[in-house]
Amino acid sequence: MFETKNNEWQVEVDGTRSSDGKEVQKLFTQLVDKSITRIHVLDIDCLKDKQTIEFFDEIIKRGLPDEWKFQDVVALTFRRGRDEVEENIENEDEEKSKTTPLTGIRQAILEGGNLRDNEFVHKFEENGCIFSAMTLEYQNASTPETIHIRAEFKGSPKIFEVSIVNIFENEGLEAKKEQSSLSVKKNLEVRTAFWNNARIIYNEIVSKQ
């Protein structure tokens, strides 16, 4: 836990169980004075199905400051939408006679490149889906550093988390990517900036409901 600015503290949880985030929320709720304290948690259940897609699309545009240039979506996790599942249950008999290439697929985890424009992803969107995790590649504007940031809703309840899963340094004329590292301080600064920008986006979307 550390102070990010006057009277604002950021808490990072290195959880080992899916319910750890929930337990930490519960602990702070019991400890703090609710009349003067606000706890910021980004919960996927507060977003409608299409809003989860809007959330991640905005993160692509605004996740990090100009120091880092977005390059690509290199991993994406999505699953059948809650609204679509409920509709299928209500119309189960009809659906049995109307099969589609996506019938039976509940969740998909894709890795590769240019995934946001992937045809399979777009088909899933058309049928109703939820984006729950995305790994984004960024190139530093002034250094040869490239990072992969994992942004995901996970745990129980599914709350938003940010981690840097890969760090590369571009070497040679061909800009070959070699495994590298960031200092603990810089790693934290990048993750904090990303999470706080995500919070702004999340609050903007929720406020439109």
Regions found by a protein language model. Give the residues of each.
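Intrinsically disordered, low-complexity, charge-rich terminal extensions
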Residues: 1-209
